């Protein structure tokens, strides 16, 4: 079986409404305020990131060795390598999965949602929802 070769990537972007393109797809970024929380589907909140916890600049990139993710649903922290293994994602495809980071911290991973450290809470004033629009170009 032949696998396509995928290369690591990193794209920096400002936090604002719009589309962020990276080599293997796109991310849709939408900004909301506290009053929008009641009107959103609970599933979307798995991809909601508190703006006060991230700053104005983020990166979308491929995973790096040692990246960790704190799952709010599972209440634990694991390396992305372990998460991808458990999800049975083929190794060559793992580099394509977008990881949004703030500095060295993992904020959001497609298919896994927002890290517990960056999720919205009762003090949230503004937040973004990240939606993966992946697909090979």
Region spans (language model):
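AMP-forming adenylation/ATP pyrophosphatase catalytic core
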Residues: 1-137
């Amino acid at each position: 079986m032949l696998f396509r070769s995928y290369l690591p990537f990193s794209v920096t972007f400002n936090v604002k409404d719009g589309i962020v393109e990276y080599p293997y797809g796109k991310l849709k970024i939408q900004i909301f305020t506290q009053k929008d929380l009641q009107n959103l589907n609970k599933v979307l909140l798995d991809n909601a990131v508190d703006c006060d916890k991230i700053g104005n600049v983020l990166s979308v990139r491929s995973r790096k060795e040692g990246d960790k993710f704190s799952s709010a649903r599972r209440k634990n922290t694991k390396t992305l390598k372990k998460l991808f293994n458990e999800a049975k994602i083929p190794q060559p495809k793992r580099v394509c999965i977008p990881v949004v980071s703030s500095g060295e911290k993992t904020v959001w991973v497609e298919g896994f949602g927002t890290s517990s450290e960056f999720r919205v809470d009762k003090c949230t004033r503004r937040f973004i929802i990240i939606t993966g629009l992946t697909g090979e170009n």
